Amino acid sequence: MLIGALAAAVTAIRLTLHVLAATVWVGGQIVVAGLLPTIRSLGPDAGKAVARALARLQWPAYAVLLLTGVWNVAATRAGQPHTWQVVLGVKIGVVLLAGLAAYVHQRTASRRALAVWGAIAGVASLAALVLGVVLAG
């Protein structure tokens, strides 16, 4: 009985950390995209300042997503059907693409590249979120 309650508590912690990190990672991108016109109106350096501040929140959240994602796979993968495993593989690829695109977006200087890599990061992050919901059933 105690072991079952402890296992349920650990599962709740694992899933809460994962969802909270996804909220910060994906939600931050959505919020900044919506605020971009206002941010740009604040001056030429406002966008960079907001990006630096957001990065201080988002990169730790991305790390938590990766760690809890591995934890989730270890806790739930056994006995899952082949289609679940395929969706998981696609999700892992999309998560890595989202991180890579966000990293390139953060490092680029051209406005066009910022738009392209930001869009790729945003779409990949949303796709990873949807695939996570699919995997959760």
Spans of features found by a protein language model:
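Polytopic transmembrane helical bundles with strong interfacial aromatic enrichment
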Residues: 1-137
